[in-house]
């Protein structure tokens, strides 16, 4: 694991290099795609990107949690969370790279 974080600027640079758009156009395209994904999730829609992953908003019910330092129980209110489920193709690619590095 490299510990490197890929940012929006990195994505825009990659689009610029690989597609041939200007950096400004590439950055706008990345923002548009991320905005569409965000808007869909806010509306409660599932976002499925074939061969990559599925993003989905799901509801978590109220539950009792515990403060790990004090051990005191505290209620955790119901909330909505975003889940990410990697596609099998992506999982396999990651596994293949990991196995190749082990050799």
UniProtKB/Swiss-Prot annotation:
CDD domains cross-referenced by the UniProt entry: IHF_A
Single GO term (MF): DNA binding
Keywords, comma-separated and alphabetical: DNA recombination, DNA-binding, Transcription, Transcription regulation, Translation regulation
Cross-referenced Pfam families: Bac_DNA_binding
GO biological process: DNA recombination; positive regulation of metabolic process; regulation of DNA-templated transcription; regulation of translation
GO CC annotations on file: cytosol
Top-level lineage group: Bacteria
Entry function: This protein is one of the two subunits of integration host factor, a specific DNA-binding protein that functions in genetic recombination as well as in transcriptional and translational control.
Similarity remark: Belongs to the bacterial histone-like protein family.
Record's subunit section: Heterodimer of an alpha and a beta chain.
Protein's recorded name: Integration host factor subunit alpha
Organism of this sequence: Bartonella bacilliformis (strain ATCC 35685 / KC583 / Herrer 020/F12,63)
Gene: ihfA
